[in-house]
Amino acid sequence: MTQRALWLRDPLGILADGAERGIVVSGDTIVELVPDGAAPATPDVAVFDASRHTVLPGLINTHHHFYQTLTRASPAALDRTLFPWLQALYPIWGRLTPDSLDAAATVAMAELLLSGCTTTTDHHYVFPAGLESAIDTEVDVARRLGIRVVLTRGSMNLSQRDGGLPPDSVVQDADTILADSERLIARYHDTSSAAMVQVALAPCSPFSVTRSLMTATAALAERTGVRLHTHLAETADEEAFCLEKMGCRPLDYLEQCGWLGDRTWLAHGIHFNSAEIARMAKAGTCVTHCPCSNQILASGNCLVCEMEQAGMAVGLGVDGSASNNASNLMQEVRAAFLLQRARYGVEKVSHRDALRWATEGSAACIGRSADVGRIAVGMQADLALFTLDELRFSGALDPIAALVVCGAHRADRVMVGGRWVVEDGTIPGLDIAALVRRHNVAAKSLHAE
């Protein structure tokens, strides 16, 4: 029996033009926008009363480290800048197990879903002995929860003994990394418009990966048609490292390795000059802004307005839950709005800009602008519905603005590919209390030694 199309009727607010009376979803796709004063042209629709809901395109998280939910507010890492912060946490992350990663990934993806996120990336680059199937574990969790993912096969092969930052216990050799990258692409990477799982390649950073691995990874991505991701220009320390070890600035090094192109998106992108921004724009390279992490680690502030003015796409990412200490993308939207409004002023940054970074901008980062990030006919039915019933929203008159300026943090309903994965503020089938208990045990175990 064919499932009836669903009309999300008369939303309180919706981030789409010409959809004042809602949208119609059939299967996994948006098939109709219903304008003011009209009814659906689609026959025999089921109805969801959206009159209490403000409807957004599903938010898209373009930088994260799921495993780091296990080291939130870790005493060893508080009040540190990036390099000392990493050095404090690498030994703890070296104790990760498949079970602890499963718990960490479940917490991260559940928190993202509950914040209105329908697509997330993850950058997993720590592979201690026994954790060789980390990405497979993340795929399993994503499928259980129903969230759309782009999982990046991270890597580190430049350890402390070779002049890098990480200890030997969390790095792998280049041959192992490249072989596993090929395996994951062959097994999981889906190129269809409805893809629920995709794979990208993501050497961690210039200070943890050899030049040869960076170059080989770019060649593999070109051959297999997948995207590239890495941290770049996050801190002044990174710039100094590149100048000392490579004899050039981080973006120059990236270009030398074959990475400056339209399949690449970069995390952070704080310490770029105007000429570098112009080069990235010309190449089609995108940047993910991570405001909470950048503030907590005092790394600096991404030049989002200069980037967009140059023609670059800017996305949004929560970054790791040990630097951000949260996996809430709606809160990240507000953080980006406040941080960039303070920098650029009221005429250059609005709440809609911040929402655009988390939707259309993020979709561009992962190469999926044709599928997700907008409410439009033909797009995947990925939607986040928020109510304004909480005390924090009382008196709010603009429902779209209220989500950002009043601090929305939890969606009431979330749809991914036409399927409800959050209902009444909960994830069906997921025992949150049991998950928290399991996750806390795993976190304490990592810190016990």
Residue ranges with predicted function:
Residues 73, 236-248, 276-281, 298-308, ...:
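Histidine/acidic-residue-rich catalytic or RNA/ligand-binding cores of hydrolases
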Residues 272, 276-284, 291-296:
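Long hydrophobic segments that form regular secondary structure
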Residues 1-21, 25-27, 31, 359-449:
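Active-site microenvironment of metallo-dependent hydrolases
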Residues 73-123, 128-148, 179-193, 440-448:
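Alpha-helical scaffold segments that flank or form the walls of functional sites
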Residues 11, 23, 28, 52, ...:
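Divalent metal-coordination and catalytic microenvironments
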